[in-house]
């Protein structure tokens, strides 16, 4: 009986590429990352394997995060890391054969705008505040995490346009 019957030739080849990518990036081997390489990028498969192997919640979450990998992941590595965390972003980039150097030594920033600041500008509490926060946060990510001053400009622009 196989331990990972979900693995096929493509996944074994992917593991070989991952081992090489880890070496090239001077990263220590990582068992969970390597297990993720042996699974197809299908969330229910990752969940089933995690349950069958009785993995911890953190390990399950990591496998499912990696299973959500996408061909667009490498376009904005730091945006990916902001969304899914550095560990999962690193896993996904390595599996994609993408450059991981943008994440080296980088810390995930905190979005520098709060809903209360929008309310203080005269917007009523509720869905409009949430919509503005989400729109400005998307722009902040797309602009590669500019300063708080730029975020305030974005807010001003959004309030002026809205």
Predicted regions and their residues:
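Charged substrate- and nucleic-acid-binding regions of tRNA-handling and nucleotidyl-transfer enzymes
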Residues: 91-162
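Conserved, hydrophobic alpha-helical core segments of structured domains
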Residues: 1-98
């Amino acid at each position: 009986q196989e331990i990972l019957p979900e693995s096929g030739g493509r996944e074994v080849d992917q593991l070989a590429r991952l081992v090489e990518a880890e070496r090239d990036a001077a990263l220590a081997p990582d068992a969970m990352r390597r297990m993720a390489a042996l699974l197809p990028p299908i969330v229910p498969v990752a969940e089933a394997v995690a349950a069958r192997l009785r993995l911890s919640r953190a390990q399950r979450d990591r496998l499912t995060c990696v299973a959500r990998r996408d061909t667009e992941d490498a376009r904005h590595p730091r945006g990916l890391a902001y969304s899914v965390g550095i560990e999962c972003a690193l896993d996904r980039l390595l599996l994609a054969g993408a450059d991981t150097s943008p994440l080296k030594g980088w810390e995930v920033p905190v979005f520098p705008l709060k809903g209360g600041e929008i309310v203080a500008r005269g917007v009523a509490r509720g869905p409009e505040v949430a919509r503005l926060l989400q729109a400005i946060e998307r722009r902040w990510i797309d602009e590669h995490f500019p300063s708080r001053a730029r975020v305030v400009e974005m807010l001003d622009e959004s309030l002026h346009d809205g």
